[in-house]
């Protein structure tokens, strides 16, 4: 067993809080740990990737992952980090999400590991067998109201105008019991999670100590936020999902390749398995080779999430869609239609109309004056070819497949226009 797994996490900034100074020593020998995801959606998102990646690293070093998909807790809703109560999802939606999440999560773990084969469990399996009296008498009795009310996630909500329902208030008891149950059944003695889960993790540690007289541990990692304070992992379209049907490898790659320089080192540390020496070398090249670090980040994460096939698809689509070298073969056009923002316009709004008007109508640029400036600055393109004449008019000769054209602003913003005749 490697003695550096704790240091590996610490060096990369993975550790926000640890419940014990003994954890570094504890992690020197194999243990079972758990990481939980509630099925509030049918896929994990990029924010969940930190916990999944940590689970992958721990498993590589011989620790056994137990991944908990919260079929029961998902029906209740976690108030942690939320200003308002979540809308409750139906049992049917939760079950559909449980099934989908389970399939996605299976991709990232080694089920053939000789000593640390993972388990994916659903807490609905044990909570559905408990009645209310049993739960309140055996579990609820172990929780002190003062401690529960003192938690930040509870205190902030209770004192807010919206308040907090008993349903949400009880969430920490459910998650606390999960830890105790997994300790008793599978010998789990470590829970990992985002920093917003610290209070829930401590609840499980306290419950296990009360009921089993044993010590278990918790480790949290920081939530992914950008340098401007905004949550990392959301594009204009919404969350960056790990399920390919919801977010293509190309979309994930494009999101990551646009990470600002000031954020890219942190994201390389938190989202990839690259060693710190290599990350430091990559970051040193930022000034000499712009976007090199972002490309490496995008390649590494896309490869980990979507495999070699997904990375190849993302790189192929990126190449096909780059202004100045757009690939208009059948494969390239397919990549554009699947991955590029697109709009349908009447042919009368495009043909024989000034390029400037069409760009504004497409939504790529808001005003004609901005488009004129773009042309002056050599950043306007039609089908990958630079437009230098502000009076340029689009004709049928410039259509692809007789009904398509691509307008671009610089190298990163493009819209595919589908003409309706």
What residues fall within each predicted segment?
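NTP-dependent nucleotidyl-transfer catalytic core
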Residues: 1-193, 197, 205, 212-217
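Short glycine-rich loop/turn motifs that provide flexible caps or phosphate-binding loops at active sites
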Residues: 35, 46, 69-70, 76, ...
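Conserved phosphate/anionic-ligand binding catalytic regions in large, soluble enzymes, centered on
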Residues: 200
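Conserved nucleotide- and phosphate/pyrophosphate-binding catalytic cores
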Residues: 210-421
